[in-house]
């Protein structure tokens, strides 16, 4: 699989899904009830991956629905300031708001997120708002699992995947499982599997792959045996502090360690991992090196207060790897 084919296209990557607001506790080591001060950042896995890859120098676009208010304008301006193309960003005209995520940092081991995602704008992206002309201008389309949780966003994502395949666009699927968005695990398994069978690159944690398979305690070999019967060329399965594995349809297996760091919080790691892994592939690195990039980026982000603002540069990633090796 060659991510660098169609070099004449306008974008390296377009991400599809949610953009929301993260409100991260400024006061550490105390519960939410006692926290008085929060800092505001752009959040949401597809938005964070767009931001992470843009900071790494890729040409990036974004498709998603945001609120037509101050928070929506904050998100749009932040992304535009990073040269992320927002032509695929739609404003909700029915008064729906973007999701809000309040983070609680009691300790590095005890972090939690209080979500406000009732009737959120991103899940009302419609198939009619997906443009084939926009999608055919990218080399890779990245879709998020959370965007499959509800109609009409679900159908919008399925249309985007169909248009990507029609126009020889590589499809990357970031599982991005969030339990608060889904009705039940059976529904999750159905729609995750539907997209995974059409994806060229699949990235997720071991637990997220278990959700897709609707089981507990699955193993990597069974997962890849099933998925390689379909379209997948590369499957990345993350195992937290035990590191991550990448498998190819050609039968290769690669592993990267998790880099030690002073952990401040536990969220944001997955988005930075996906950003840096894809950047590595776009840069012509081998899969093993791309895995290292992902692990290093995740290590950097969990050591900092934000997720989107903390997305590292290529120099920061390479410096961490060099110092660790």
UniProtKB/Swiss-Prot annotation:
- Write down what this protein is called: 5-dehydro-2-deoxygluconokinase
Lineage, highest ranks first: Bacteria, Bacillati, Bacillota, Bacilli, Bacillales
Q: What molecular functions are annotated in GO for this chain?
A: 5-dehydro-2-deoxygluconokinase activity; ATP binding
Q: Which cysteines are joined by disulfide bonds?
A: none
**InterPro entries in alphabetical order:** Carboh/pur_kinase_PfkB_CS, DKG_kinase_firmi, Myo_inos_IolC, Myo_inos_IolC-like_sf, PfkB_Carbo_kinase, PfkB_dom, Ribokinase-like
**Protein family according to the UniProt entry:** Belongs to the carbohydrate kinase PfkB family.
Protein task: Catalyzes the phosphorylation of 5-dehydro-2-deoxy-D-gluconate (2-deoxy-5-keto-D-gluconate or DKG) to 6-phospho-5-dehydro-2-deoxy-D-gluconate (DKGP).
By its UniProt entry, which SUPFAM superfamilies does this protein fall under?
Answer: Ribokinase-like
What is this protein's gene name? iolC
Keywords, in A-Z order? ATP-binding, Kinase, Nucleotide-binding, Transferase
This protein's source sits in the domain of life called Bacteria
> NCBIfam families annotated for this entry?
myo_inos_iolC_N
Q: Which GO terms describe its biological process?
A: inositol catabolic process
Q: Which reaction does it catalyse?
A: 5-dehydro-2-deoxy-D-gluconate + ATP = 6-phospho-5-dehydro-2-deoxy-D-gluconate + ADP + H(+)
Organism of derivation: Listeria innocua serovar 6a (strain ATCC BAA-680 / CLIP 11262)
Top-level class of the enzyme under EC nomenclature: transferase
Q: Which CDD domains match?
A: KdgK
